[in-house]
């Protein structure tokens, strides 16, 4: 959680484009359409979507507000299931021994091991609950600026994909070069000169 934390780690974005119709309706519809499912798919390894900042485990944008001053405020929630490798190894060893006893053989084939591993993975995937990670978002639509409160690569990639899908607006992550392109008041020639610079090696 970024907004209520004592320390912040954030990524800055420039949002390219504007809505052609009512802004509030477009944002609300995009959030609702791509909110994280209330009921998780027990076989799905990763699930991601929007949820209200004040209610991250109840993604109801009809009930909870997404307006915070001049900003739209909401959260990206990523639910992920992670099965420890040693847990799979343990259950595989038990299942292999059981298979040997049932077949009367002292070995099993590579294909049989693959089938056993897939079966065990499916069973564990069903049983193990997802672990949620929540990343807050602050979006100033008028200024075309947005803060995502994380710098994790995977979270940023999920955010960029879901944001574009939700609003049909392109989020451009701000680095020195993209700041020159999107935020500076330099002329076209000046921008070209800056973008052609190479890093200095010490």
What does each of the following model-derived ranges do?
Residues 1-24:
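N-terminal alpha-helical "arm" segments
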Residues 5, 67, 138-141:
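Short, flexible turn/loop "capping" segments at secondary-structure junctions
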Residues 11-13, 72-75, 144-150:
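Short cationic amphipathic helices and targeting signals
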Residues 20-21, 81-83, 154-156:
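Primarily extracytoplasmic ectodomains and periplasmic/lumenal surface modules that are beta-strand-rich
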Residues 25-62, 66-136:
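Surface-exposed, low-hydrophobicity interaction/linker segments
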Residues 86-94, 178-192:
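Internal, charge-rich low-complexity segments
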Residues 102-183:
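Internal, hydrophobic cores of structured domains that mediate oligomerization or house catalytic pockets
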Residues 188-202:
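Aromatic/basic-lined ligand-recognition segments
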């Amino acid at each position: 959680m970024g907004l209520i934390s004592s320390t912040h780690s954030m990524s800055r974005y420039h949002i390219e484009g504007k809505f052609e119709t009512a802004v509030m309706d477009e944002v609300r519809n995009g959030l609702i359409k791509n909110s994280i499912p209330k009921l998780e798919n027990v076989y799905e390894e990763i699930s991601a979507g929007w949820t209200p900042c004040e209610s991250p485990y109840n993604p109801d944008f009809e009930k909870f507000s997404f307006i915070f001053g001049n900003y739209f405020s909401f959260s990206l929630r990523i639910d992920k299931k992670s099965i420890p490798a040693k847990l799979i190894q343990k259950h595989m060893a038990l299942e292999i021994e059981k298979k040997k006893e049932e077949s009367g053989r002292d070995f099993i084939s590579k294909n049989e091991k693959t089938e056993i591993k897939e079966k065990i993975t499916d069973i564990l995937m069903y049983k193990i609950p997802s672990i949620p990670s929540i990343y807050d978002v602050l979006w100033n639509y008028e200024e075309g600026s947005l803060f995502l409160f994380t710098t994790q690569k995977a979270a940023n990639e999920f955010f960029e994909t879901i944001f574009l899908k939700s609003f049909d607006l392109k989020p451009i992550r701000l680095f020195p070069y993209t700041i020159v392109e999107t935020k500076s008041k330099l002329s076209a020639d000046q921008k070209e000169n800056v973008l052609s610079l190479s890093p200095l090696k010490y």
